[in-house]
Swiss-Prot record:
The keyword Secreted applies. Disulfide bonds join 51-57, 53-196. Its EC number is 4.6.1.-. This is Dermonecrotic toxin LbSicTox-alphaIB1a. GO terms for biological process: killing of cells of another organism; lipid catabolic process. It comes from Loxosceles boneti. The active site is at 11, 47 (nucleophile). Belongs to the arthropod phospholipase D family. Class II subfamily. Class IIa sub-subfamily. Keywords: Cytolysis, Dermonecrotic toxin, Disulfide bond, Hemolysis, Lipid degradation, Lipid metabolism, Lyase, Magnesium, Metal-binding, Secreted, Toxin.
Length: 279
């Protein structure tokens, strides 16, 4: 049977030591917060207070140091390599920036990732990367990122980059932001809320419907932050591709239940995260 590849996304992995911790619990993907300084340089992998219930909000690294740790965890011949870690979502905390700094943020982000993660195109980390942007007005971050990789001689690395607007905006508004950014694929659509609060699945279902329609812009849908078995089952029943969680082992447990193991499998590196799954 054709099973939907599933991404178990470890939430708020902001210290290098947490990469091992979350992957060992079953995550094949992690989400990392990126804060910016006043000149739009990516500065720390830091969330800050408040954050999810039951989590420490203040773990951090310098962004470039984190990229090096992540590179080691995703480079096949490295002693820190995790074969199953195949995707990272950078949750870009651009709320501290003016709208007109978005292009610069994208440019500086690209330079950091190119140097410290991709090793300037020389046997760097292999994980796919989703740039997750909280504000539709900051779509030029994507433009800045793309133009910088191109001008720095590595346009091919855009094959490894996907996109997400994480503000729970109306699906139509997200579509027009992508149009402005010139994005025509590699789209992950998030929906969710902190684990301290409850959120229904109506917008998730709308995103799934867009993904599965012939003219939708979405390739993958993920839901955050899910820590309980019941809400995991509800999200899987709604047809999501990814679940972001503080407890990867809980999601892995549910995926191993017979009802779900018949329909889902844990995604591997061979699963293209930019491809819409067709049943």
């Amino acid at each position: 049977a054709n099973k939907r590849p599933a991404w178990i996304m470890g939430h708020m992995v902001n210290a290098i030591a947490q990469i091992d911790e979350f992957v060992n619990l079953g995550a094949n993907s992690i989400e990392t917060d990126v804060s910016f300084d006043s000149s739009a340089n990516p500065e720390y992998t830091y969330h800050g207070i408040p954050c999810d219930c039951g989590r420490t909000c203040t773990k951090w690294e310098n962004f470039n140091d984190f990229l090096v740790g992540l590179r080691k965890a995703t480079t096949p011949d490295d002693s820190n390599y995790h074969e199953k870690l195949i995707l990272v979502v950078f949750d870009l905390k651009t709320g501290s920036l003016y709208d007109n700094q978005a292009y610069d943020a994208g440019k500086k982000l690209a330079k950091s990732i190119l140097q410290h993660y991709w090793n300037n195109g020389n046997n760097g980390g292999r994980a796919y990367i989703v740039l997750s942007i909280p504000n539709l007005a900051h779509y030029k971050l994507i433009t800045g990122f793309k133009e910088t990789l191109t001008s720095d001689g590595h346009p091919e690395l855009m094959d490894k980059i996907g996109y997400d607007f994480s503000g729970n905006d109306a699906i139509g508004d997200v579509a027009s932001a992508y149009q402005k950014a010139g994005v025509t694929g590699h789209v992950w659509q998030s929906d969710g809320i902190t684990n301290c609060l409850l959120r229904g699945l109506s917008r998730v279902r709308e995103a799934v419907a867009n993904r599965d329609s012939s003219n939708g812009y979405i390739n993958k849908v993920y839901y955050w932050t899910v820590d309980k078995r019941a809400s995991t089952r509800d999200a899987l029943d709604a047809g999501v591709d990814g679940i972001m969680t503080n407890y990867p082992d809980v999601i892995a447990d549910v995926l191993s239940e017979s009802a779900y193991s018949a329909k889902f499998r844990i995604a591997t590196y061979d699963d293209n995260p930019w491809e819409t799954f067709k049943n």
